[in-house]
């Protein structure tokens, strides 16, 4: 996906105060008012009140978010309707997004003003991501995509009930109205999906017809004669031949909503985050944990960090970890506010490890990528030191959405949010997983059935990679040790005000102790705290903070744990490939293609979220969103190529492609004619 820099909207005001796009020379809404147009063209045009009545969810996709008036009007109508759907999903794409100040200061009609204030408070940085903003306890979900409309349409995974086409006039903004728009709409449309738009341009009507929509003109408003309305009614049932259609069909294993609970194995960060996400979607959960407490193993450190990534290529790794950092920020901010969880979302500093780098080179990278200052800033060592309250050895990145949190408290807060919809079973060790009929049966070490369900999610770290379960994913086990010391045993000038990372990390004082680290060694089973590892961590601390004098070793304590890391350093999140499940009684994979993950058949109702590596907090928060959408059938709040990047089937596909390439090379060499002068040459 090409992530070219995003230009925020340049908005002028006409003499009467109507906002106007400087780029397109067009007004954002008619002078008769934004709310009147939203109601007449979109809410009435798509018959929202009648169509969402009594439904579990309703999905709207808008092209052209503008200043958010259509979303705000839809949200207000949903709130005022006692027969509304349980959940409203509103997806919107905007190539030139407004700023937070634009959202906050634009004049609104009275019914929309309090909602606009809530929207401005949650407004995200202008980055290439799907930004999820949840309102009304998660019942209303706004998903914003900033950047090229055609590029984003190709990345969406959703079944859309109503389309709002609200870009600037086709003559002024043709890129938003080309054939790619209508083709993507046909792919995303649910049966009977509706379309409304204020324009009656012939090219728009013809494009909709060619894509399988029945099109009609309707009376306009605010002095406009006609508007366009349409209904998806293709002559033939679309086949999932496109890349994204195939991807969605094979990997979205929507669980039957027959009252059967979703079973999650593992009550660490990943399992608890998913339990909360499913509870928000109205699903019951049975959460099984072999230990005697929640988040007692790899998730059991006193504190953990979350932050984004800056990389010149802005590839899948950088974009995934950026999205994960945003998800973690939202989760931690909520947990701190609602449950008093120890943590902070006030930012984080990451020292640049490149000895040749300076603040100017860091800023040049920020400028080239076009990332905004409310996501990341490049700071000199002096500026970073002033922010941290300690003397730092190098220039740094300041991630405004970074921070730290107590992982155990965060996990418990997720379960508190889920409430009675989650049944927690501690001390249950899942020894085997078997397929019996159309259900998964989980057995303990005595062969006794613990639970049976149609949908199971493996979030149990090492247990998810038990090869007896047929999971040939390349992962390695990594031991890590963190160290801590009483804040009074350190020079006050060595205790930072906010988290610092780089060659290691150090956190602010938490309950009177400063945590820092961490070592990493592959393999091994030694869980004892090692003095040599404390020395290594103290050395890391000294490389982060200038003149951080080491305390006596006998005053340092610590903790060890293990984490799983995949070969490509990305987590493993999604539906388990059927090609991995022969030992579970499913037989050989029915898949006829293995070259791309999207074509690999999946084990019905079996998912995994594991190998979260060193970014467990952030990856757990985002992984929960990915899996909740896949299980419930809700729109994905993560773009398709990032779902590709963490797909459990990616390793099978890579192995298959390597084998095919080797076979092709062998076949090519076998038919190669002998060189002149060699035996057998003519």
Language-model region placement:
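The AdoMet/dcAdoMet-binding core of the Class I SAM-like
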Residues: 51-160, 179
């Amino acid at each position: 996906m090409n992530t070219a820099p995003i230009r925020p909207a340049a908005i002028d005001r006409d003499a009467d105060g109507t906002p106007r796009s400087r780029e397109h020379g067009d007004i954002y809404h008619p002078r008769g008012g934004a709310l009147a147009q939203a109601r007449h063209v979109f809410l009435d045009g798509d018959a929202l009140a009648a169509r969402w009545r009594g439904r579990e969810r309703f999905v709207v996709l808008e092209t052209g978010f503008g200043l958010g008036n259509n979303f705000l009007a839809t949200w207000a109508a949903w709130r005022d309707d006692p027969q509304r759907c349980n959940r409203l999903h509103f997806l919107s794409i905007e190539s030139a997004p407004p700023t937070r100040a634009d959202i906050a200061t634009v004049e609104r009609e009275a019914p929309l003003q309090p909602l606009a204030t809530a929207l401005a408070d949650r407004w995200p940085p202008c980055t290439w991501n799907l930004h999820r903003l949840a309102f009304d306890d998660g019942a209303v979900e706004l998903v914003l995509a900033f950047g090229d409309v055609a590029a984003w349409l190709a990345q969406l995974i959703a079944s859309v009930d109503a389309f709002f086409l609200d870009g600037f006039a086709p003559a002024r903004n043709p890129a938003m109205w080309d054939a790619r728009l209508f083709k993507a709409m046909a792919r995303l449309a649910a049966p009977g999906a509706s379309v409304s738009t204020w324009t009656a341009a012939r090219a728009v009507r013809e494009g909709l017809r060619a894509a399988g929509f029945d099109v009609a003109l309707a009376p306009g408003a605010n002095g406009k004669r006609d508007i366009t309305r349409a209904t998806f009614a293709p002559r033939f049932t679309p086949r999932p031949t496109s890349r994204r259609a195939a991807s969605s069909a094979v990997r979205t294993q929507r669980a039957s909503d027959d009252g059967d609970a979703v079973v999650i194995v593992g009550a660490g960060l990943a399992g608890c985050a998913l339990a909360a996400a499913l509870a928000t979607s109205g699903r019951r959960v049975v959460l099984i944990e072999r230990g005697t407490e929640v988040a007692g193993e790899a998730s059991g450190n006193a504190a953990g960090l979350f932050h984004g990534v800056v990389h010149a290529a802005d590839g899948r790794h950088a974009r995934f970890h950026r999205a994960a950092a945003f998800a973690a920020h939202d989760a931690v901010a909520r947990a701190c506010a609602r449950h008093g969880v120890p943590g902070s979302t006030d930012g984080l500093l990451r020292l640049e490890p490149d000895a040749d780098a300076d603040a100017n080179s860091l800023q040049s990278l920020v400028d080239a990528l076009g990332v905004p200052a409310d996501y990341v800033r490049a700071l000199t060592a002096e500026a970073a030191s002033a922010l941290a309250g300690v003397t730092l050895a190098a220039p740094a990145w300041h991630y405004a959405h970074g921070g730290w949190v107590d992982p155990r408290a965060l996990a418990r807060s997720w379960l508190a949010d889920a409430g009675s919809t989650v049944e927690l079973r501690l001390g249950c060790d899942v020894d085997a997983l078997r397929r019996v009929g159309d259900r998964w049966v989980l057995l303990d070490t005595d062969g006794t059935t613990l639970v049976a369900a149609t949908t199971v999610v493996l979030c149990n770290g090492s247990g998810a990679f038990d090869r007896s379960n047929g999971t040939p994913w390349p992962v390695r086990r990594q031991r890590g040790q963190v160290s801590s010391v009483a804040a009074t045993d350190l020079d006050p000038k060595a205790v930072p005000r906010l988290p610092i990372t780089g060659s290691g990390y150090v956190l602010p004082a938490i309950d009177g102790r400063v945590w820092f680290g961490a070592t990493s060694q592959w393999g091994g089973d030694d869980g004892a705290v090692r003095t040599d590892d404390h020395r290594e961590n103290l050395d890391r601390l000294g490389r982060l903070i200038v003149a951080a004098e080491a305390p006596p070793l006998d005053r340092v304590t610590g903790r060890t744990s293990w984490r799983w890391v995949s070969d490509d350093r990305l987590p493993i999140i999604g539906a388990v490939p059927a090609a991995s499940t022969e030992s579970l009684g499913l037989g050989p994979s029915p898949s006829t293609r293995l070259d791309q993950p999207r074509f690999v058949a999946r084990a019905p109702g079996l998912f995994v979220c594991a190998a979260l590596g060193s970014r467990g907090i952030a990856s757990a928060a985002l992984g929960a969103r990915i899996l909740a959408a896949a299980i419930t059938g809700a729109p994905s709040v993560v773009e398709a190529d990032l779902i590709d990047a963490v797909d459990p089937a990616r390793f099978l596909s890579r192995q298959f492609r390597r084998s095919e390439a080797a076979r092709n090379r062998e076949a090519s060499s076998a038919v190669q004619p002998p060189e002149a002068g060699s035996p057998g040459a003519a």
